[in-house]
């Protein structure tokens, strides 16, 4: 990391010296925010002519609640803080949209509305110090700039005293607060970039070249995590904050894009900075969010971020879903059109994923920050195509059993032609109803938790885009497994510490699933209090699980090795929980009654998450993974623990009373020296198949003692058999597509020992 930082510093120094020089005597262009007078005139001409897509997008804007000229602001003395900042940001957004409508229609009622909103805040605002004040400040400053004419004058209906009051608040409250925030070197990019943007925009609004230069330099400040490249965006395009969550990465791109637009309208090319670093960041974001979880991510040392030490971002976060097709602040259209139409770059070669995302997401409509990017930035419809053909039929559609849930998945569309889906469900395989519609979302996995344990459900899927829906998928069925409290083999449950209680449940679904309920104060300190599902082993061992619990009602959950079941005993393992339910840390207690030591992993970890704890001699190591294939070491320690010990999964709710928390771990695999069964079960016997109708075969066979599950195979030639299901019962209803002659075979799956 140090070498990379040095190279970046040298590059940026040369860039600043050679490419960036801003005159203190400059004259600003107005309106000079995200839209110039040229942009506004282009929009007006297309809207007046009824051209598409501008006319339809304009109609959408004018029907939007925040774009009404009757909008009333709700000002307060403080502009930041929970609840207040969101409403203040909406007020600023409303003022911006009304100001744009004034330019396009000439109707002063819109300008009057924008002026009323800004005047109300100018008269009321006293401080900008509470949480994330930079967001609403940015919106209001941009809105005020949009109330200007091309000669620099303001809308004449905005009374001079009212206008000056607002401008004074920008100079004395908003700008200083944003500038101060940029001195905090440990903040996230999505917090820093809007603050730097506030400084830049203040300079334009106040016609103050020195302030504008401050903001411009802050965007390129190589010492801060949040500056627009090297900090927010790596040279590869990797978005740093996507290791935190997907949404904040999009927020960062939105603010950098607005800064680039503002600078471009003043004659400065931030778009080109860092070898088109903004384009690389948007392309990276779009690659992941068009449904490509294989997007590479190099782990980052986050020491100092959030005033924390020893934490890292290991992979693109599982938080806030991901796979969203709409970055905030209308940035995908602005970036696409600038690099494609203004700079003439080849979109298919140089930013193919942005091109895919733009084509799928058009037309851009309202979102939390600005939206309407298709209306604002489309220059030529020939270079901005919409989807005109429905998606292809879903492939490899399947439903799979889960513990009290069902997983539905399908293959990512090869033609990149789907932007969402309609999922249908039935309890009889005949009468289907719509279960879920998800638009502007490219994930191809859905977890159905609104199910009755023990019940079988049938599913079918239609992919969607702007042009319509695909052909319906084949039908697939699965059962929400209720689990059993009879744990397999030598697995057991224990409440660690007196007063702790809970229990364990098991099902063969998802390659062996354990649900661990635990009431307990903590994992750590000099003694533990938790629920523990474990197995006694001897020698080296590796426990691998996928933690799937997503309900944030726990304190700490994870994997653990223990020398004894005594609450004060030696232990080593990995937990998720604590602050925000998202801290991942390794723990170890080297001797009975000693304090627990911790090794920080990440403070932005979320389920689903793969976990692993491994013992090799007296060395104990812990790992996490996003996909179960690529693993990242959290920490290792060398300590004594008896050769025979306990390994398993733990859950505690942080309380000494009340309800337990059920942590769910699937794909449980234990590799241990003594983990093999003494006697391998015999093959199932008594297999029978009876046709209950022309396309349904009812299969049954005899129970086998200690078998975990059964794999059912089917063939049409009695030679080549394909696996069709894994079940824990001794029967299966097999629905085939066509009547005919079929052959079946059943084998035992014996996974509990690993």
Please annotate each region the language model reported:
Residues 385-418, 453, 465-484, 676-706, ...:
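Pro/Thr/Ser/Gly-rich low-complexity, intrinsically disordered linker/stalk tracts
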Residues 141-240:
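Active-site lining segments of carbohydrate-active enzymes
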Residues 481-678:
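Extracellular glycan-recognition regions
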Residues 24-185, 270-386:
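Extracellular glycan-targeting catalytic surfaces
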Residues 436-442, 723-728:
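Short beta-strand segments within Ig-like beta-sandwich modules, predominantly Fibronectin type-III
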Residues 413-429, 704-721:
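Solvent-exposed loop/turn segments flanking beta-strands in beta-repeat/beta-sandwich domains
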Residues 448-469, 734-753:
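Beta-strand-rich modules
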Residues 442-447, 609, 728-733:
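Short S/T/G- and acidic-enriched coil/turn segments that sit immediately N-terminal to beta-strands
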